[in-house]
Amino acid sequence: MLHFIVNLNFRINTYKMKKFKIEFKWAVIMSIIFLAWMTLEKQLGFHDEKIKWQMFFTMLIIFPNFLLYYLALNDKKKNYYNGEMNWKQGFISGVVISFIVVIFSPITQFITHEFITPNYFDKLIALSVESKRLTLEEAKSYFNLTAYIWQSISGGLSFGIVIGAIVAYILKPKTTNSTIKSN
C-alpha cells in the first residue's frame, strides 16, 4: 500500500512539473541572461568608472526581459496550449516564471556580487557618501548583498507579473474561443 501511495504522489508531482516545464526553462534562461547583463555592465565600466550611470544602464534590461517574457509565453502558447492560450493562462504562466526567477535571484545576486563584480558595493558606498546623497551608515545598509537580494525578489516579482500580464494580453487570441483548454 505504501508503494502505491509513493508511486501515486510521484506521478502527481511529475505531472505538475511537466505542466510548468516551459516556465522553468525560461526562468533559467532569464537568470543566465541576467548574469550576462551584469557581466556586460561590468565590462562596459558601469561598475567602475561609469558607476554613477549604472542605474540608468541597468534599466535598459527591461527590453531584453520583455522579449524573453514574450518568447516564453509564446513558447507556452505553441507547445503547451497548441496555439490557443487565453489571457488568464498566459498571465498564470508569467506569474510562475516570475516566482521561479525570484527563487533563483539570491543565487544570481551572490554570483554577481561575489564573482562578477566583487567591489561593486564598496564603490557604490563611496560614491553615495562622496556625493553626500547618503551617510556612510545609510549607504552600508542599502548597498549590501542582503539588501540587493530583497530588492531583486520584490522587483523581480512585481516586474515579472506586470510584464507577464502585458505579454499575455498581446498573445491572447483576437477572438474569444470557449473551447480553449483551461487550467
Task: Give the ranges of each region predicted by the language model.
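Alpha-helical transmembrane spans of integral membrane proteins, capturing the lipid-embedded, hydrophobic core
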Residues: 23, 27-35, 62-66, 94-98, ...
